[in-house]
């Protein structure tokens, strides 16, 4: 909560707040660029440059954790809005295709599950969402937190599939799409060459593939079908981060229970666990780690 405020009338003590770390026009972030704001601080002072650009706002949700994972969820939202399709050859229609087929490759991690949750909430809902992984345990957990029955109630056919058990991944995945010819929107949630190439191969006509997972190798590349790019209007792009509007949308949808940010979280800890968790993060399996800064 906000503990105290200055003479301005925009904020009031006691309000829940959310904060966008990607400040427009600067590289510095409230993560670790400020001396009195960010990091693992129990209390902090928000400087003017964060407030004046609209990166601090209040929300009416009934929990605190939902705003704490608003940044990764806003990245997911940005990904959906970055995809586009073409109408009448020249008009770009932004967003995923309504009533189409979405494939979320490597989608049983925290970000992928956030993408599944968002697909069930958007106004231009797809008809089918196919989520892939190569780990049965992760696929089982994914179905526990976002079940195929829940998706059906929201008008979407959701299928979890282990591609490691497929003899012909391309053809078997295409067969799961609405018309059996491929996917209108493909999201690649792991920076693996083979997965990216698979995503390119399962695109339908006018399909759009989003390399959502950010590679750390600056020479990361993959073979793509440029014939399909020319004759079948396929598109490949990438998205990273999100903007203020994306984060506000996440906060609002979470408050209305339209999306489930909790699906991203697998570990919960207190302030005393911050140091060890941060130092050993690469060795801790699972999804997001929610660490409370309260005493």
Task: List each language-model region with its residue ranges.
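Glycine-rich beta-strand-centered segment in the early N-terminal region that forms part
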Residues: 1-23, 38, 50
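NAD(P)H dinucleotide-binding glycine-rich loop of Rossmann-like/cofactor-binding domains
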Residues: 20-100
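Glycine-rich phosphate-binding loop and adjacent beta-alpha segment
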Residues: 143-153, 190-256, 293-295
């Amino acid at each position: 909560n906000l503990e105290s405020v200055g003479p301005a009338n925009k904020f009031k003590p006691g309000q829940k707040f959310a904060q966008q770390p990607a400040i427009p026009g600067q590289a510095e972030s409230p993560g670790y660029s400020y001396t009195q704001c960010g990091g693992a601080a129990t209390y902090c002072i928000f400087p003017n440059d964060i407030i004046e650009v609209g990166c601090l706002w209040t929300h009416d949700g009934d929990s605190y954790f939902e705003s704490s994972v608003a940044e990764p969820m806003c990245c997911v939202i940005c990904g959906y809005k970055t995809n586009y399709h073409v109408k009448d050859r020249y008009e770009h229609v932004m967003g995923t295709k309504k009533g189409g087929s979405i494939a979320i490759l490597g989608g049983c991690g925290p970000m992928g599950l956030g993408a599944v949750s968002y697909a069930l909430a958007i106004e231009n809902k797809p008809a089918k969402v196919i989520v892939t992984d190569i780990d049965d345990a992760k696929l089982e957990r994914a179905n526990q937190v976002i079940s195929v029955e829940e998706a059906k109630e929201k008008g979407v056919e959701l299928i979890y599939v282990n591609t490691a058990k497929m003899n012909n991944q391309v053809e078997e995945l295409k067969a799961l799409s609405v018309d059996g010819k491929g996917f209108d929107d493909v999201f690649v949630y792991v920076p693996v060459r083979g997965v990216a190439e698979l995503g390119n191969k399962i695109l339908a006509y006018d399909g759009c593939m989003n390399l959502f997972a950010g590679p750390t190798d600056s020479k990361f590349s993959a073979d793509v079908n440029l014939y399909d790019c020319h004759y079948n209007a396929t598109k490949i792009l990438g998205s990273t981060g999100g903007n203020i509007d994306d984060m506000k949308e996440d906060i609002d949808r979470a408050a209305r229970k339209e999306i489930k940010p909790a699906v991203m979280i697998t570990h919960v800890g207190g302030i005393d666990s911050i140091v060890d968790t941060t130092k050993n993060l690469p060795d801790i399996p699972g999804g997001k780690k929610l660490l409370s800064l309260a005493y």
